[in-house]
């Protein structure tokens, strides 16, 4: 991985628990910010999600949904903004982590710039429905302006989950 040019963090985290085969109620949202001035040849930033084992040391299978997204802001695709992944589904029971990698495309190809792992997601049949907390609701309303296809109607639906 190249030197750090960006920070990547979860703005809306994956749930702590989910049911196998059912999509997460809310999308996972990542925040991307440059550290200093990114390399001039970066043309586009993309995040992609994969599933890891509980320790985060090995790949796991069973993640499906919209696994890639462009980094966007109010002005379109940018070097600083947000990316929305989802709906995401984990097909089998177990304990996993979501790994999200930030990649930069340039005329020279694509390179991974950063990655972040979620906390453990316990996938089991008895998992409660994921409902946004009041803090998440407030944050989701702020994100409606960020060109991520999140609407007040979506937020209301997630609150009723």
Name the predicted role of every residue range:
Residues 1-56, 64-68, 86-89, 113-117, ...:
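N-terminal onset of structured domains
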Residues 31-32, 65-67, 79-80, 101-105:
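Short amphipathic alpha-helical surface micro-motifs
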Residues 62-76:
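Solvent-exposed serine/threonine-rich low-complexity stretches and specific carbohydrate-binding patches
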Residues 76-84:
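Aromatic sugar-binding surface patches on proteins
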Residues 78, 131-140:
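Short, surface-exposed secondary-structure junctions/capping segments
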Residues 78, 91-93:
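Surface-exposed coil/turn segments at beta-strand junctions on protein surfaces, enriched
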Residues 93-112, 117:
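Internal, hydrophobic beta-strand segments that form the core of beta-sheet-rich folds
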């Amino acid at each position: 991985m190249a030197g750090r040019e960006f920070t990547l963090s979860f703005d809306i985290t994956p749930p702590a628990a989910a049911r196998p085969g059912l999509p997460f109620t809310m999308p996972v949202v990542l925040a991307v910010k440059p550290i200093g001035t990114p390399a001039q040849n970066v043309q586009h930033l993309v995040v992609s999600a994969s599933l890891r084992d509980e320790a985060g040391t090995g790949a796991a299978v069973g993640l499906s949904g919209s696994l890639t997204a462009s980094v966007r802001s109010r002005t379109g695709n940018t070097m600083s903004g947000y990316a929305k992944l989802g709906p995401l589904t984990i097909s089998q029971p177990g304990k996993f982590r979501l790994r999200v990698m930030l990649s930069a495309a340039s005329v020279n190809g694509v390179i991974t710039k950063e990655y972040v792992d979620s906390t453990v997601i316990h996938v089991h049949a008895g998992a409660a429905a994921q409902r946004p907390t009041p803090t998440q609701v407030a944050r989701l309303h702020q994100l409606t302006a960020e060109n991520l296809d999140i609407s007040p109607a979506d937020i209301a639906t997630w609150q009723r989950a």
